[in-house]
Regions:
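Gly/Ser/Thr-rich loops at beta-strand to alpha-helix junctions
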Residues: 1-5, 27, 148
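N-terminal small/polar loop signature for handling phosphorylated ligands or for N-terminal nucleophile
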Residues: 1-20, 119-130
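Basic, gly/Ser/Thr/Pro-rich low-complexity segments located predominantly at protein N termini
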Residues: 6-7, 35, 144, 178
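Generic hydrophobic alpha-helical membrane-span motif
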Residues: 8, 29, 64, 160-162
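A glycine/threonine-rich phosphate-anchoring loop and its flanking beta-alpha core
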Residues: 13-111
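Active-site segments that bind and position negatively charged phosphate/pyrophosphate groups
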Residues: 102-187
């Protein structure tokens, strides 16, 4: 899961050694990104870490994990649409660094999900494969940009706010999905 992979990323970074990511679910793009999510009861931050040298994802295991996790991964990917809009706005208004290649890869990842939404089904290895591939490319966009901007914007800020105020927050991707709907309405 995400916590174990984040610990491996941080340890890899701290010891300056390679690591291999072996996700058992496909619930977020952290399986390949060069950032680790550090959470405690009051805050959530991202720390610089190593991206994996390889990812080994067994599509059968992922397909047999709870479908809610795969759905959360899809919602995390769809949030790339608002993340890119936010990044473009920051570039235009604040002259923030912007990478067209990272943005394009991020949008492509989100579009692969929306274009294939009808074929993403519980227990189907092809569904797991598609979601893992798109999570992988979304995480690669983060590596290209050198920041989380291609995959994290106002919808993620909304999710972090929910983490603080809810007694029992939902899955990260679920919260980002709701945040995406709200933020896209503002655009």
């Amino acid at each position: 899961g995400g916590k174990v992979i984040d610990v491996a990323k941080l340890a890899s970074y701290d010891k300056n050694v390679f690591f291999v990511s072996m996700p058992t679910t496909a619930s977020h793009d952290g399986i390949v990104s060069p950032l680790a999510s550090i959470k405690n009861p009051k805050t959530s931050t991202s720390a610089k870490a190593h991206a994996p040298i390889a990812v080994i994802a067994d599509s059968k295991i992922i397909a047999n994990s709870p479908f809610r996790l795969l759905s959360a991964g899809c919602a995390d990917l769809i949030s790339n649409f608002t993340a890119i809009k936010d990044w473009q706005l920051a570039h235009r208004l604040k002259n923030e660094s912007y990478s067209e290649s990272a943005a394009s890869l991020s949008i492509m990842s989100a579009k692969m999900i929306t274009d294939n939404v009808d074929s993403i089904k519980p227990g189907l290895e092809e569904s797991a494969r598609l979601v893992v591939k798109t999570l992988f490319s979304s995480g690669m966009a983060i590596s290209i940009a050198g920041s989380s901007r291609p995959a994290s914007g106002s919808e993620h800020t909304f999710s972090h706010a929910l983490d603080k105020i809810l007694d029992k927050p939902c899955l990260h991707g679920e919260q980002c999905g709701v945040g995406t709907i709200l933020m896209m309405y503002l655009y």
